[in-house]
């Protein structure tokens, strides 16, 4: 079948000549330098930061010579999440997570910047002079080499200014990235196929009177090519009401509605044409005079003259730079009904910007052609409008969607806009970049905020990446996960200790496997004995601290020198009662400085025959060294003023011992509400020691709390825990909206972080079930992500009593197979007709 329409090859019409020294050279002798652009993430930029970004663009563009073109091109492509279910060693829950997000659609953003040097003649040409309209293109020769050299130098300055801004990163594209190479398409090929995949293929381009097609895709173009289409006032950003409150502000760039907020395949092209500023103003002066002389024939001429005068007055009085500008949104679809919907969506988003939506059907081919990377000088001059540089820059999209961390270690969280899974490193990468100085975390989330779900989700992924995890809990939050790990590892991991009267948790704080007592070990013993001896509100005297320190040091010297003495609390008590008493007598230490009888009397319950003699004299050492997932459940003693703090300290001390022996392996201790047991003045130094030691031995200390009052009323929490936790994690705080000022001050949060926290769960997608979480790293990097999990993970993590009862009852029916019970229960919820048995 013959094609009866006029046809030509892309080769005949192709406007580009070559790529030399990383620059695209057009057949009309225009030079273009191409960059890949990294923008800040969505919802993470404040008004002041948007103004700083605007200022950086302004300074950078000012260094470019006359008759340069700045073309920013933002591709937004709908893609589907591809799960990594074939990965070796993937656990049951990880596989469930990946399957849950299988083919989840999301909008991916690719941003490019093209800086072009053209000539005065080319910059004035209209659409009928486009290379698309010429029968044959004869390559032109670059006659002025010095102009090219100066332009390349200016581009280098432009790049430095933008990269030094701290917000936007430019990376110059290489020749293979522009033209492509074996198996990888370049940006030009990708543009012609409306794709960003490396394996894209070229498609036929159809130019018809009523539409333009690329392959099966129909193009839909909206333009901002007249100053009448713009609102009366432009700004760098606007308030995003969906995520703002009367106490917080969420900001987006002015053009964000046609960026990541427009959920269809589209390209947003932003052009700024830098002509000769002085000549522009001179031409306007001449036009104003002409309008004045013709004003008697039409009032419109007088009005236009006044507008031009105002433009000139602004330019001269404020030193503003006169430029031309054009923006367009080019969307596409292979479905005509879809194109109608897209046309309405684009029009609505432009209306949100208070712009007049102008659906352009006439200039689609020439504007598409001018959008080819390197062919910016082919832009039809009649499609641009005069404005000032500052106003033109307000039409730039200044944010992108969330990105994954470039790190082998991390946790999977979901993008709060699209729900796409992201790999987020909140431990190692921030330390490498100098954003944080430790890996410790402080988690604050009220009851019902999804705190337990998040911590379960986090520690599971840490465990699966080789970390040793020790949890101190007071609410059975980790029972399901621990049991699942226990069954899967045949009892090697997932060890669950519960404190009962029949089987209490007992330790020996004086036992050291290698016989070496370092400073941290001595400090933990002193803190433990101080906790037994003094009440929380009773501070020891300096003389008492010295006496206790000397007693511990002397006892350690005894047991390391005399192997016949069994290290335990009983022998320590006897040593103080007999040997140390004689030492004090020889030194003439007075009773008011250290009351040894009072000391022994208070500690007697922990000595042989006392009420708690089992607690510190264990002859069985818990094997915490080789078990990678351990939970201590202290719910039964959380209200016991003696047992709770002592048991918590001993667990922490045992964790420190574990850390010393496991070199080069990540260790994590997570303390839920049990931190309250150690938040006393006497323990402040010990907690600081713990945090210092954790950092030294590749560890992470994580404290979790739900009561705001607890952290507000405790100076120990601020000084010892919060100040030593560079990662702050907060969940929904809306119930504490009226108290948030004190929380903000306590945690040292910025106003930007406050706005992000108060936006949590404000505009959740109705079709997805998730809770949002805020992360702050070192007070300089922060974002909100979503904890969205599969049904299998949901039933493993749930703390809802009825759901836990249902799950464990089903597991009992299945012979204790919790994994199978989770699978059956999840499947029955997905397909209500199925039975769990």
Residue ranges and their predicted role:
Residues 47, 51-63, 262-263, 355-356, ...:
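P-loop NTPase motor domains
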Residues 750-809:
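Conserved P-loop NTPase
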Residues 132-161, 353, 445-450, 796-821:
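Short, cationic low-complexity segments
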Residues 1-399:
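Extended, folded cores of ATP/NTP-driven motor/assembly subunits in large transport
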Residues 23-29, 102-107, 317-322, 414-416, ...:
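Short glycine/proline-enriched loop/turn "hinge" motifs that connect secondary-structure elements
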Residues 465-467:
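Conserved SF1/SF2 helicase motif Ia
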Residues 85-90, 127-132, 374-377, 485-489, ...:
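Short secondary-structure boundary/capping segments
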Residues 427-460, 469-481, 495-503, 635-755, ...:
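Conserved P-loop NTPase motor cores
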């Amino acid at each position: 079948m013959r094609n009866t329409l006029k046809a030509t090859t892309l080769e005949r019409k192709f406007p580009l000549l070559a790529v030399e020294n990383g620059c695209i050279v057009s057949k009309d002798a225009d030079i273009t330098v191409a960059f890949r652009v990294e923008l800040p993430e969505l919802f993470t930029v404040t008004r002041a930061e948007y103004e700083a970004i605007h200022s950086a663009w302004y300074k950078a563009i000012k260094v470019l010579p006359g008759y340069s073109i700045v073309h920013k091109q933002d591709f937004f492509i709908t893609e589907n999440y591809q799960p990594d279910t074939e990965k070796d060693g993937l656990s049951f829950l990880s596989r469930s997570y990946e399957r849950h997000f299988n083919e989840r659609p999301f909008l991916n953003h690719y941003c490019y910047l093209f800086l072009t040097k053209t000539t005065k003649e080319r910059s004035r040409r209209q659409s009928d002079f486009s290379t698309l309209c010429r029968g044959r293109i004869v390559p032109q020769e670059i006659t002025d080499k010095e102009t090219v050299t100066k332009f390349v130098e200016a581009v280098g300055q432009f790049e430095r200014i933008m990269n030094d801004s701290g917000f936007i990163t430019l990376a110059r594209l290489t020749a293979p990235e522009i033209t492509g190479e074996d198996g990888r398409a370049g940006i030009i090929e990708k543009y012609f196929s409306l794709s960003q995949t490396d394996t894209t293929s070229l498609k036929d381009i159809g130019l018809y009177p009523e539409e333009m097609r690329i392959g099966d895709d129909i193009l839909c173009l909206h333009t901002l090519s007249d100053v009448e289409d713009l609102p009366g006032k432009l700004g760098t950003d606007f308030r995003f009401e969906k995520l703002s409150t009367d106490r917080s502000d969420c900001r987006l760039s002015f053009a964000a509605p046609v960026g990541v907020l427009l959920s269809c395949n589209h390209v947003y092209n932003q052009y700024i044409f830098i002509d000769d500023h002085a000549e522009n103003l001179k031409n306007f002066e001449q036009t104003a005079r002409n309008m004045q002389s013709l004003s008697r024939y039409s009032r419109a001429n007088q009005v236009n003259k006044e507008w031009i005068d105002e433009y000139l007055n602004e330019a001269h009085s404020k030193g503003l730079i006169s430029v031309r500008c054009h923006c367009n949104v080019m969307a596409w679809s292979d479905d005509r009904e879809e194109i109608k919907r897209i046309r309405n969506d684009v029009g609505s988003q432009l209306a949100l910007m208070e712009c007049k939506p102008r659906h352009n059907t006439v200039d689609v081919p020439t504007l598409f052609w001018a959008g080819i990377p390197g062919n910016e000088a082919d832009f039809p001059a009649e499609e641009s409008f005069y404005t000032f540089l500052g106003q033109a820059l307000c039409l730039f999209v200044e944010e992108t969607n969330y990105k994954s961390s470039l790190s082998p270690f991390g946790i999977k969280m979901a993008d709060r806009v699209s729900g796409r899974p992201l790999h987020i490193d909140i431990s190692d990468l921030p330390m490498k970049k100098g954003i944080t100085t430790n890996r410790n975390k402080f988690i604050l989330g009220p009851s019902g905020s999804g705190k337990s779900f998040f911590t379960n989700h986090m520690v599971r992924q840490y465990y699966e990446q080789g970390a040793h995890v020790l949890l101190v809990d007071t609410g059975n939050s980790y029972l399901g996960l621990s049991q699942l790990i226990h069954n899967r590892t045949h009892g090697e991991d997932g060890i669950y200790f519960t404190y009962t009267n029949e089987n209490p948790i007992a330790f020996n704080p004086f036992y050291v496997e290698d016989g070496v007592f370092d400073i941290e070990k001595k400090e933990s013993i002193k803190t433990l004995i101080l906790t037994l001896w003094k009440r929380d509100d009773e501070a020891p005297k300096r003389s008492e601290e010295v006496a206790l320190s000397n007693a511990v040091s002397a006892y350690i010297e005894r047991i390391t020198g005399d192997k016949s003495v069994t290290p335990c609390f009983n022998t320590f008590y006897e040593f103080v009662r007999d040997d140390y008493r004689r030492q004090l007598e020889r030194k003439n230490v007075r009773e008011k400085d250290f009351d040894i009888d009072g000391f022994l009397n208070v500690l007697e319950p922990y000595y042989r025959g006392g009420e708690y003699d089992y607690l510190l004299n264990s002859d069985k050492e818990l094997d915490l060294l080789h078990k990678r997932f351990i939970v201590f459940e202290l719910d039964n003693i959380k209200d016991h003023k003696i047992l709770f703090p002592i048991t918590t300290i001993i667990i922490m001390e045992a964790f420190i011992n574990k850390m010393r022996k496991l070199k080069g392996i990540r260790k994590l201790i997570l303390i839920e509400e049990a931190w309250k047991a150690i938040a006393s003045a006497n323990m402040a130094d010990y907690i600081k020691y713990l945090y210092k030691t954790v950092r030294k031995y590749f560890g992470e200390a994580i404290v979790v709390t739900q009561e705001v009052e607890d952290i507000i009323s405790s100076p120990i929490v601020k000084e010892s825990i919060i100040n030593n936790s560079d990662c702050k994690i907060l969940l929904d705080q809306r119930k504490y909206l009226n108290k948030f000022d004190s929380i903000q001050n306590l945690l040292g949060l910025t106003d930007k972080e406050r706005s992000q926290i108060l936006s949590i769960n404000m505009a959740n997608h109705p079709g997805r079930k998730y809770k949002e979480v805020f992360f702050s790293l070192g007070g300089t990097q922060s974002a909100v992500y979503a904890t969205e999990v599969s049904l299998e993970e949901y039933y493993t993590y749930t703390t809802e009593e009825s759901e836990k009862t249902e799950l464990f009852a089903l597991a009992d029916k299945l012979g204790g197979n919790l994994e199978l019970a989770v699978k059956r229960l999840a499947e029955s919820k997905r397909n209500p007709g199925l039975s769990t048995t």
